[in-house]
Amino acid sequence: MYRVLRLLPLPLSVAISLSALADEKPPNWGLCPATLPLQGFEQAPGMDKHVVQSRPQLPTNIEGDTLTGTARTPLYQGNVLMARGDQFLGADSVRMDTETDSYVAEGHVRYQDSSILVVADRAEGNQDTDVHKISNIQYQLIGRRGNGVAKSVDIHGQVGQTHEATYTTCDPSQAIWRLRAPEIDVDNVEGFGVARHAVFEVGQWPVLYLPWFKFPIDSRRQTGLLYPQLGYSGRNGFDYAQPIYLNLAPNYDATLYPRYMQKRGFMIDTEFRYLYDDGKWQTRAAFIPNDQLRDKDRGRFSFNGYHNIDNHWQARASLAWVSDTRYMEDFSSRLVGMSSLSSLQSTVGVYGTGETWTAGLMADRWQLTDYSLDESALAYNRQPRLFFNWDKPVFDFLEFGLYSEVVRFKHDDAYLVALQNDGNYLRTGEVIRYYGGTRLDVKPYLLLPFTGASWYVTPTFGWRYSSYYLDSGIAEQLNGNRTPVRSLPIISLDSGVYLDRDTSVFGRNYLNTLEPRFYYLYVPYRNQSDLPLFDTRAFTFSWGQLFRDSRYTGPDRQNDANQLTLAVTSRWLDQNTGKEDLALSVGQILYFKDSLVTLNDSEERIQQGKSVWVSDVAYNVNDRWTLNATYQWNPNFRRDDLASIRARYLIGSDGIINLAYRYRRNTLDGTTQLKQTDFSFLYPINPRWSAIGRYYYSLLDKKPLEIISGLQWDSCCLAVRTVLRRYMRDRTGNMDNSIQLEFVFKGLSSVGQDTDRVLRRAILGYYRDDLYLVPPSNTTTDPDAYDPNKIP
């Protein structure tokens, strides 16, 4: 029998509220039972947001084995089923009162919609007043595995109250943890819930008592405490932070991070975010009064934001400041040796982009953040920099372009430091004065791309004009000329051929390619000894260097050249899968004359003859084994200048082993510059236990750079990670130790230090998806990051 009426909404408060506490990143439920504790209606459809939003407009169908009673109080009995959209309600019997719009559902009451399953003994209420009461319920969230029980739920419109409720994502037969509360109030209008006298239990043991606990129940943000962060390190001792979130308005908020470090004292860290229609910005500031280890006040500040002026123009700023040169060492856990630890850059600018052009006006400043260095290690400040780039294809075979910029360079004076007998670095009192200047660099070019089905020839004709207006101090250090000028043509011819054939190796069919490439470059000599070095250095020789029109990063030097690059790449592509199993590349530059331009007196001239051989190999042995190698051989000195070998083995669905060897020679004096081994792994011992580790060792210094060891235990609803780490904390070789412990309560939150950040950096492939990220291209849409030496 069928009858159309409104269906009880049953917004189960406890389940809706506690599910909002889940992690943003989907947890791994692979160790959970294949079936959920509660099973739904076979007729129930999948999640459909459009159906959910249109529920009030949909009719309700009701059916049962028998219909008795009166017109006012019909009684449905036997396999009663009510359905509306994605909502289903089943019971042994449902009695209705059509005048008061009340109902009573009894016997095996079941409810299901797109997000939840509910089993109860009894449900009663009034659909007109929207007041309902559900007794002795068990619930199961769909998709999140959250489940629990409640003695009763009282619903008054959009406000609900649960009694004697629990929540866990564990299987009910093995509930490792659960959240229990005698009373939870939920306000769907305001978007928050309040739990009173809540207890968090692990096993049968209560581990956390919350007399009053307010939490969000939807995506709306709520002011309150976030989960604490715990850790221990040799530098700070016991480390505890308690984040406090402040939802100040719909478009701006703040987070406070009160932090206690056993060896340093108290620290306050703050973050403020502001969002509006045309942009957003974020500030972060930290302050530690009287750091007990340094005996002084310390702090930092950062600002990042942008504002969209119109469809073509955007203003951007990224500012950073720290109180002293030891701040980064003391409060950063990254390995040293990176420029980001020795200096901080602040930039502000206005940038524009169009279909054929980019332009901008910006300024930046560098701050020294390494106590063992002086200001001479800093880059020049650009205050300001104005640039304009234009590229316009005219025909299929003709393209015009222009790179141009004008920059005013400034530099802080360098106050020299020296290492003392006690191991500290102190100022010596000596000062090196730095001077700046203004540089104009213009680089127009004409490009003629000719292509065929299996070949291409691209001649390029460019011209570089650079002029300077130098401060008198820097001009005197050179040749005394304050307005030097350099002007010269740059001519190149890039060509290549694509050949392929069908072949078979060990019974597998391959498409084998042969891709020779020829790149000729001619640049006449210009004496550049009277030009300063503001932002120019030599590129590290690599495969990409074979095809650049300059071996320097900036316009202060443009090398002369009469050279030809010969290179070839061969690939083996599996014809069944399309995968590239093997790729071999080798190349070399032939110098037809000496290159007289050098960066400075310490750089040797390029002699007529041959460059080092550059080779790259990428071999995918199978779906689990990959090998990569890079090698550079110097035929002039009969020595290897660079070698890099990397092997990776994938274990199961998430395990990995990485092994790498890196070697680099200082090409100026022939000494070994770098010699390292790197071994890291995530090894699954069994489905629950896995070992993690890294041993990063310098063969040159005969000491480790980083050692990581740890264990992970995983289950359906709980994961525990413990990580022991020893790492180099500064460029002088001082080491530090840390202990990180993290408990991940799946579907709820994590407690302890965030181990993911450290492990993802140390173990490539710790997150398997990281292996398949597309590496950044050499090209960029950032108008402040263009390479003035690169012609497309």
From Swiss-Prot:
Protein's UniProt name: LPS-assembly protein LptD
Known partners and oligomeric status: Component of the lipopolysaccharide transport and assembly complex. Interacts with LptE and LptA.
Keyword Membrane belongs to the record: yes
Listed HAMAP family: LPS_assembly_LptD
Main location: membrane
Stretch forming the signal peptide: 1-22
Function, as annotated: Together with LptE, is involved in the assembly of lipopolysaccharide (LPS) at the surface of the outer membrane.
Organism: Xylella fastidiosa (strain 9a5c)
Coiled-coil spans in chain: none
Cell compartments where the protein resides: Cell outer membrane
Gene Ontology CC entries for this record: cell outer membrane; transporter complex
